[in-house]
Amino acid sequence: MTAHDRGFDGVERRGLMFVLSSPSGAGKTTLSRLLIERVEGLSLSVSATTRPMRPGEVDGRDYAFVDEKTFAAMVERNDLLEWAHVFDNHYGTPRAPVDAALSSGRDVLFDIDWQGTQQLREKARDDVVSVFILPPSAADLERRLHTRAQDSDDVIRERMARAAHEVSHWAEYDYIVINRDIDEAFAEVQSILKAERLKRERRTGLTAFVRELQRQLET
């Protein structure tokens, strides 16, 4: 059994699903990368998607790239914890690897939208911790979308229009982080994860630990 299985203080715990959502360009992908790089015991959920692979992406690392027929079969077999249709493509989270991680005390990071978060909450409410990342202003969000130079002006306009709808779901999340500065936002998100890992109900080995402590105190 590893330190992650037992928790960092030696007490066994169940893993959690740590969800980051935001409008495109608000910073959730950058924050997800920083969490994976800097936080021990956290792995990124690899989504299945029907969208084309982008330059530099690796199948199985960034996404599991599948065709529409394969994705439909996964939905039919209930192999996905959540799935959504976004910008003419399907995205979904395979169930089996997440279940295995949580059972062994490891945490799984989800970079998904509000639709996926709703589905996760419906299926596994006690395991889900959700964080919505907001930009400091609409102008700042548009500037970020232009700066990353990934999309045409038409696509950026579409993303800005969609952002208004996505932001309307902010109150469905457990925590809200306003990303004015990426380092400050990361510190806030990391603090949320640290606190949630210590929740009593997730620490499955706590009862046995306290009983043993009581036994020692009473002898």
From Swiss-Prot:
Keywords: ATP-binding, Cytoplasm, Kinase, Nucleotide-binding, Transferase
Location relative to the cell: Cytoplasm
Catalytic activity annotation: GMP + ATP = GDP + ADP
Keyword Transcription regulation: no
GO cellular component terms attached to this protein's record: cytosol
InterPro entries: GK/Ca_channel_bsu, Guanylate_kin-like_dom, Guanylate_kinase, Guanylate_kinase_CS, P-loop_NTPase
Entry keyword annotation includes Kinase: yes
Molecular function via GO: ATP binding; guanylate kinase activity
Domain of life, source organism: Bacteria
Domain Guanylate kinase-like: 15-194
Protein residues bound to ATP: 22-29
EC number: 2.7.4.8
Leader sequence segment: none
Main location (coarse class): cytoplasm
Entry-linked NCBIfam families: guanyl_kin
Similarity field: Belongs to the guanylate kinase family.
Function: Essential for recycling GMP and indirectly, cGMP.
Protein name stated in the entry: Guanylate kinase
Species whose genome carries this gene: Nitrobacter winogradskyi (strain ATCC 25391 / DSM 10237 / CIP 104748 / NCIMB 11846 / Nb-255)
Gene name for this UniProt entry: gmk
